[in-house]
Amino acid sequence: RIQDRFQTRLNLTAANADEVVRKRVLQKTDTADSSLSIFYGQHEVVLRNLLSFKNAATMHLYSSPASFVSDYPFIPYQFELMGRVLTAIRENAATGLNLSSGERSQLALFMKSAIALKEERIGVLAPVPLFYDALKGFVDSIHATVINRAEEGGVLEAFDVEVLKLLFMIKYIKEIPGNVDNLTTMMVSRVDEDRLALSKKVVASLERLIRETLILRSGD
């Protein structure tokens, strides 16, 4: 289990939020280091083909066994992305609750999301919508109500709601357009994911969300 691969120690003294997360939430045992390095070596090409972005700013992906070990089950681009998401929500869609922009907020996001995956076995990856549960308490009622109604309406599939959460999270982030390629990458949840099948699933969800007037069609 992923849970068995971490040695979690919390000490918020680092200046850099992603380093805080890596050192205090994602620190692995020696045995886990070895297992994850071997796993990466076996799946490096698969991961390279699975994770890609189109017309986006630089989004860092796994670059080596060490990169995979240090960030797993998260993907390197998610650290910078979630920093941008925190800023965007604070500026555009936040409640009156305190949502700081520093390392404590980002640590909380990754810690809660890591806990959600703690029973999973090696091979799972964190999809971006997983972070929404850690964010939703800070989202204003206008935005939160739309997602809550989508969850409770009984018309949409569960995957549709996850896509809706993702679209909300990147709504104000110009560095990563919400095209099908990028949405597909951010919805990846397993190393053995069939990217083509996932892409078709994303397209079907977008069509249903458009039909329910929850989103508008824009570009690709």
Residue map of PLM features:
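A short helix-turn-beta junction within AAA+ P-loop NTPase domains corresponding to the substrate/partner-engaging
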Residues: 1-14, 25
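Minor-groove-contacting beta-hairpin "wing" of winged helix-turn-helix DNA-binding domains
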Residues: 220
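Metal-dependent DNA phosphodiester-chemistry modules and their immediately adjacent helices/loops
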Residues: 20-30
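C-terminal helical "lid" subdomain and adjoining coupling/linker elements of P-loop NTPases
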Residues: 32-38, 45-161, 173-180, 189-198, ...
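Short alpha-helical "packing" element that flanks the helix-turn-helix/winged-helix DNA-binding module
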Residues: 163-167
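Short, hydrophobic-biased segments on the C-terminal half of alpha helices
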Residues: 203-207
